[in-house]
Amino acid sequence: MIFEKVRNIIAEQLGIDPEEITMESSFIDDLGADSLDIVELIMALEEEFDIEIPDEDAEKIKTVGDVVEYLSNIVE
């Protein structure tokens, strides 16, 4: 499932427990990510799913759920 993959990538990138990550988690407010973390996270997701996320789409991604929804529309 996409959520598990995304959660593991986020946990690894941010150095946090995967159990802390929910669909509603905000990268900045809940998970403590800064703008550099988000750029690195987008790059890791692009590599994992073999896709390219345009900057205008990346700017709209604020929560874990946003990532999962975005990837679901592209990958499946």
UniProtKB/Swiss-Prot annotation:
Tell me where in this chain the PTM O-(pantetheine 4'-phosphoryl)serine is found. 35
- Pathway annotation from the record: Lipid metabolism; fatty acid biosynthesis
GO cellular component labels: cytosol; membrane
What SMART domains would the database entry show?
A: PKS_PP
Which keywords accompany this UniProt record?
A: Cytoplasm, Fatty acid biosynthesis, Fatty acid metabolism, Lipid biosynthesis, Lipid metabolism, Phosphopantetheine, Phosphoprotein
- PANTHER family on file: ACYL CARRIER PROTEIN (PTHR20863), CARRIER DOMAIN-CONTAINING PROTEIN (PTHR20863:SF76)
User: What is this protein called in UniProt?
Assistant: Acyl carrier protein
